[in-house]
UniProtKB/Swiss-Prot annotation:
This is DNA integrity scanning protein DisA. NCBIfam families: PRK13482.1. HAMAP family: DisA. The lineage of its organism: Bacteria, Bacillati, Bacillota, Bacilli, Bacillales. InterPro entries: DisA, DisA_sf, DNA_integrity_DisA_N_sf, DNA_integrity_scan_DisA_link, DNA_integrity_scan_DisA_N, DNA_integrity_scanning_protein, RuvA_2-like. It holds the Pfam family DisA-linker. Residues 8-146 form the DAC domain. Homooctamer. The keyword Transmembrane helix does not apply.
Amino acid sequence: MEENKQRVKSMINILQLVAPGTPLREGIDNVLRAQTGGLIVLGYNEQIKSIVDGGFHINCAFSPASLYELAKMDGALILNETGSKILISNAQLVPESSIDSIETGMRHRTAERVAKQTGSLVVAISQRRNVITLYQGNLRYTLKDIGVILTKANQAIQTLEKYKAVWNDGITNLGILEFEEVVTMSEVVHVLHSVEMVLRIKNEILSYIHELGTEGRLIRLQLTELLADLEAEAALLIKDYYQEKTQDHHQILKKLQELANTQLLEDSDLVKLLGYPGQTSLEESVTPRGYRITSKISRVPPLIIENLINRFKTLQGVCRATINELDDVEGIGEVRAKKIREGLKRIQEHLYMSRHN
């Protein structure tokens, strides 16, 4: 899993470097349109030095126009790691010929071998096929047309909307069961599965956003709007049902995100994520602490909610508390105690109305 996280992080960094709207991408697109082809290496360390033969050491500031003009030469361009300077033009690259390559064209084969030998980012721009291919270590990625990525991103947003609706239905049903004191592990796991799918699709959309660069602003806004409050509520859901109260619920949500990125989770995986043994029955009754529901009461800060849960232990404990008992909790006076009682009643009524709509 750690290796996969590293690969994802590397790919995000690479895509941000060559995303539309960046000077480097503008230069690459100019070369692509001119159909001259090109080979660009980012980074000039000892390993790169050992495979560079000839070339002109120009050490000038990067500009898209300079890249376009210098790419007309047959050799490779060597840039610094950030792409802000062009260090060498028309360089011949001589990587180890024994390094395996799946490529057939000379330019792409050289790019793949250089990337594998040095770990540097290498960009190969095809002369005839209008394709930009990125290499770094064993990573290989072909940049897609912006129109294709936008179509995929919009499809993913539509899919996310469907899973958001599944989440809304599940969390509404769970809220009703919480007030009725009939929650089982099955209902909690069902809601967590919808969180898993939302997080999985979110990760896919983020990869499109990274690749789209400035063209992805609208997609990012849609994603932010769709996920508003969902992740915060999911963290409180975990806080409600995690076996040990002291566990950091944000860390558990982060772990769920990591797992969702790498595999489809079974019911037992989610049960274990909540701190229970994997063989725990899904029919087992579970009791919410009440963080998620009480956080919906207006003008009740998190510190007061913490005091409430510490005093009454569960959501039902809070619901059953009298005005005087609520008044005894630190930070809650008579006025706030009444607001808490009224707030819980309104939330319960809203949940029942939502289920029947």
